[in-house]
Amino acid sequence: MGNRTHEYYIRLVEEDYFGSVARQDMAGILACFTEDARVTIYHGDNEPRRFSGQTDPDAAPLHTFFDHLLANYDPYFDDFTHFVDAENDRCAAYFKVRLTPKASSPYAASGTLNLRNCNFFECRDGKFHNMTLYYVNPDAANMAGPAPTGFPKAN
C-alpha cells in the first residue's frame, strides 16, 4: 500500500513530469519513471505503441518517445483534472495539450495541435512504473501534410 499523499501524486504528474516535458528536460522526464517502466499509447484506431525503460522485444526504448516529441514540438499542458488513489499508488490526469511544431519538424505544415489526453499512472517507489496514455486529436481530419501522431512511426 502507498505511503505518499494525494498532493505528492499531483506534483509528480503536473510539475515533475509534465513540467519537465514542457521545459524539454529529458533527465527530469526520465527521473519520473522506474528503470523498468512501461508506457503504452493509444491514439484513435491506430495500433497501440509501447515503450519500455528496459530492453523489450515488444517495445521501443522509453527515451525514443520523448526524443521524437521534443525534437518536433514545443509542448504546453494545462487544464488538469486529477484522480488520485494514493493508497494504491495510482493516479490519472485528464488535461489539454498544445503541441506547436518546431520549424525544422516534418510536421511544421500541420500547424499547432490541440489535444485532449488522459493518462493513467501506476507507481512504484514514488515513480511511474506503468503509464497508459489515451489522446484525441480533434483537428486531425482537417490537417494538411503528414498527420502527426506524437510518437515515432514504426520502421
Predicted region positions:
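Short, contiguous strand/loop micro-motifs
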Residues: 4, 13, 52-53, 105
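A beta-strand edge to alpha-helix "cap/lid" segment located at domain peripheries
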Residues: 2-5, 70-155
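A solvent-exposed, acidic/Ser-Thr-rich amphipathic alpha-helical stretch
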Residues: 7-9, 26-28, 34-88
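Short, low-complexity N-terminal intrinsically disordered segments enriched in polar/charged residues
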Residues: 1-35, 149-155
